[in-house]
């Protein structure tokens, strides 16, 4: 009799767990949504002692564009991420977010960019301790007036994994800062994987900021964050093809186009060989850009000095041990 009671109790517990799992799966799929194409607001920022914003962009002048993936304020040198085979799923503390965001902004500020692009900037996330990280970015343009554009990349349902410290629900986006006036901006939706994989691929987009030039044409500035952790690199290639088609249309209309961001691609084409590391088992998506993807008229500019090779991204399965180059700080 006692044995039957134990079996019945265990059966009820298992049934309850099964119901919870089913309800969670229903919640995740029901909560999943895509933001879609939309116009974006341009915010003009200034302080009491700020130098007035510079006039329209001049042709023939030299301008500096920076790009940095903020990694939701988590990626200190010794941080490892669970999706890369590491151990951690969130920033370690509010203090860690503060220190990392200040460090990223200080580095970018030191470059004195005319245009600064940021990716994976959380506005409200479990993984980033619900800190609005956009508040840090204005310091990158300290001392001058500037325009700011924010595009929400994704608004994910609660990811109950890893079980001990779930990644949680996260709202994250991309931010563009400009010392020159931005006339208008828009969000463009990118294709993502289908089925269950779309829950890991999240939502993806790029923002388009239109900046007038003295010649009457526009500087069209693209800020992007392509897919990572997909089954292979095919979807990011498809996204890149869409971006290139958009840029080529602007180029043929006489406008000037620059795209920067986190490509989640091996931009050098042979990063493991260059940096003397073995490709990790989780690196199936960080593939070289297939030949012919970038059309004539557009050029891929990779920040790389062959005499002094420095990777733009480290693999995150171990604390700051292995490095690759995909023009991003994380994914």
Language-model region placement:
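Catalytic metal-binding/acid-base residues of hydrolase active sites
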Residues: 71, 122, 154-155, 181, ...
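Surface-exposed cleft-lining segments at the edges of enzyme active sites
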Residues: 88-93, 121-125, 190-198, 225-234
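His/acidic metal-ligating clusters that form di-metal
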Residues: 205-222, 232-276
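Conserved small/polar residues in nucleotide/adenosyl-binding loops
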Residues: 323-329
């Amino acid at each position: 009799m006692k044995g039957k009671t134990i079996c019945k109790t265990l059966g009820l517990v298992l049934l309850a767990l099964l119901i919870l799992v089913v309800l969670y799966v229903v919640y995740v799929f029901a909560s999943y949504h895509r933001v879609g194409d939309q116009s974006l607001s341009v915010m003009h920022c200034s302080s009491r002692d700020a130098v007035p914003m510079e006039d329209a962009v001049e042709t023939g002048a030299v301008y500096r564009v920076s790009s940095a993936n903020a990694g939701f304020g988590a990626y200190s040198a010794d941080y490892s991420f669970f999706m890369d085979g590491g151990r951690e799923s969130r920033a370690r503390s509010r203090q860690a977010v503060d220190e990392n965001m200040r460090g990223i902004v200080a580095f970018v500020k030191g470059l004195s960019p005319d245009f600064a692009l940021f990716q994976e900037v959380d506005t409200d996330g479990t993984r980033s301790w619900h800190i609005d990280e956009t508040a840090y970015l204005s310091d990158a343009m300290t001392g001058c007036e500037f325009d700011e554009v924010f595009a929400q990349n994704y608004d994910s349902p609660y990811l109950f994994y890893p079980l001990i410290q779930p990644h949680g629900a996260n709202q994250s986006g991309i931010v563009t800062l400009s010392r020159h006036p931005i006339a208008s901006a828009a969000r463009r939706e990118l294709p993502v994987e289908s089925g269950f994989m779309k829950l890991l691929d999240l939502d993806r987009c790029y923002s388009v900021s239109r900046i007038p030039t003295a010649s009457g044409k526009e500087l069209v500035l693209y800020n992007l964050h392509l897919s990572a952790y997909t089954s292979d690199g095919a979807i990011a290639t498809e996204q890149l093809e869409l971006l290139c088609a958009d840029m080529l249309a602007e180029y043929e209309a006489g406008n000037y186009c620059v795209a920067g961001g986190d490509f989640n691609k091996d931009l050098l084409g042979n990063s493991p060989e260059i940096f003397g590391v073995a490709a990790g088992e989780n690196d199936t998506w960080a593939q070289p850009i297939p030949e012919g993807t970038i059309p004539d008229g557009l050029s891929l500019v990779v920040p790389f000095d062959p005499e002094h090779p420095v990777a733009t991204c480290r693999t995150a399965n171990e604390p700051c041990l292995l490095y690759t180059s995909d023009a991003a700080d994380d994914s």
